[in-house]
Amino acid sequence: MYVRHLGLRDFRSWACVDLELHPGRTVFVGPNGYGKTNLIEALWYSTTLGSHRVSADLPLIRVGTDRAVISTIVVNDGRECAVDLEIATGRVNKARLNRSSVRSTRDVVGVLRAVLFAPEDLGLVRGDPADRRRYLDDLAIVRRPAIAAVRAEYERVLRQRTALLKSVPGARYRGDRGVFDTLEVWDSRLAEHGAELVAARIDLVNQLAPEVKKAYQLLAPESRSASIGYRASMDVTGPSEQSDTDRQLLAARLLAALAARRDAELERGVCLVGPHRDDLILRLGDQPAKGFASHGEAWSLAVALRLAAYQLLRVDGGEPVLLLDDVFAELDVMRRRALATAAESAEQVLVTAAVLEDIPAGWDARRVHIDVRADDTGSMSVVLP
């Protein structure tokens, strides 16, 4: 798989750009702040419908405009597929697949399969659980695009249930007992969609675990052994496959956990149980990586998580596109060499670098130089001829 064309309109610092890309390695070179990462961000957005840098879409739209457009043409096994994504201010985002409108932007997920390495990856080890949940969900969505709808529905139900919890004090004051019947309805919906999301995550962690261990050993052969696990906000012992029985069991356990925390939830007005409270546990030896890993160990583990994702996607069928956003500058010589070796088999590798010296020696790559120019609305990124 490779991206043949990337077009941007009013995306971040890019007013207008059309890039013809090729299989193999391409390096986008330019000083920091010139818009290199914005190209990688656009491709990652096309992969997951989300940015790796911000949680909202608004910052992706160029200042002074009301919409951004990302256009890609992806070649997979000789077949071309065109995707256009429109990110709008105050409106629902839109998508087109092969120039035809689709019902939901989620319908284009899976066209581009990519793995992203970025400086923000250190947050997978040292950051909050939300960073690790997003890593799992993004990978699950790339592998099984239907998970995007599962997560979206869970988040919708979670918002509704949270709003209902916050309304309970007022309902009690008015003597309205119907709110508790409504809460039970939302409990059932939360359990249904939450169980499906948890089952997908557990299955993914089980497949990732041996790959993370192998990748970490490659990157840090003298360090402790790496391991990962899934920590849920409820009892999940037992299920390991994504069968209907497992999802039903998880839903029952989630309902039981909601009932057990009901008083605390009503008191605090928040949902205390569910996949939005879960975490991916990372360990080095018998210690948690967060708080105990050195800087080098943390980087090795973060890269190992991405390499494990890359390996799973390869096993699924087809080489995913590798997106390396200024990551070589963050790694020492040994880890840089290990990542470069892993990337050798990829059909397409797209890299950003502030200076060419950040690229591993001996890499044969096309170079695209990025600059900035001023216009009436400020500065904008451009590709040098």
Swiss-Prot record:
SUPFAM superfamilies: P-loop containing nucleoside triphosphate hydrolases (SSF52540). GO terms for molecular function: ATP binding; single-stranded DNA binding. Signal peptide: none annotated. One of its GO terms (biological process) is DNA replication. GO terms for cellular component: cytoplasm. PROSITE patterns: RECF_1, RECF_2. It is found in: Cytoplasm. ATP binds at residues 30-37. The keyword Transferase does not apply. The keyword Cell cycle does not apply. Keywords: ATP-binding, Cytoplasm, DNA damage, DNA repair, DNA replication, DNA-binding, Nucleotide-binding, SOS response. The RecF protein is involved in DNA metabolism; it is required for DNA replication and normal SOS inducibility. RecF binds preferentially to single-stranded, linear DNA. It also seems to bind ATP. Belongs to the RecF family. HAMAP family: RecF. This is DNA replication and repair protein RecF.
